[in-house]
Amino acid sequence: MFCKHLSFVAITICFLLVLAKTENEIQQKNIKFDQRTWRNMRSNGYLALPRQGRSDNQPDYTCCGMPLTKYVGICPIGMECCPGLKKVLQKSGQRTIYSVCVADAY
C-alpha cells in the first residue's frame, strides 16, 4: 500500500516538475520574442505610441502627396498634386516616365 502511494506521489512530482520547466521555457521564449519584436519596431521607426496623429478614417485620395522616400509617392495617372506641391515628370530607364509631386519651393 505504501509503495503504491509513493509511486503516485513520485509520478505527480515528476509531472509537476516537467510542467514547471515547460512553463518557464514558454515564458523565456515570450520574453525573447517581445525583445526581438521591440527591436524590429524600433529599427523601423515605430515609436510604440498609441495612434498619435493618426486618423481612424480612410485616407483622402483626392490629391497626390509628396513622397517620403525615393520610391514612394508616384502619382497615379490623372491625379493632381495636393495644394502647395507641383507635379514633376521623371524618367526611369529608357521608356518609363512617371510623375511625382514635390514641394513648390524646389
UniProtKB/Swiss-Prot annotation:
Tissue distribution: Expression is seen in the peripheral and central nervous systems in tissues such as the brain, the inferior buccal ganglion, the gastric ganglion, the olfactory lobe, the peduncle lobe and the optic lobe. Expression in the brain is distributed in the median inferior frontal lobe, the superior buccal lobe, the prebranchial lobe and the pedal lobe. Not expressed in the vasomotor lobe or the palliovisceral lobe that controls the cardiac system.
Residues modified to Glutamine amide: Q52
Signal peptide extent: 1-20
A single GO cellular-component term on record: extracellular region
Keyword Signal: yes
Keyword vocabulary terms for this entry: Amidation, Cleavage on pair of basic residues, Neuropeptide, Secreted, Signal
GO biological process: neuropeptide signaling pathway
Function comment: Evokes contractions in the radula protractor muscle, and may regulate feeding behavior and gut motility by controlling muscle contraction of the buccal mass.
Protein name as annotated: Small cardioactive peptide-related peptide
Record organism: Octopus vulgaris (Common octopus)
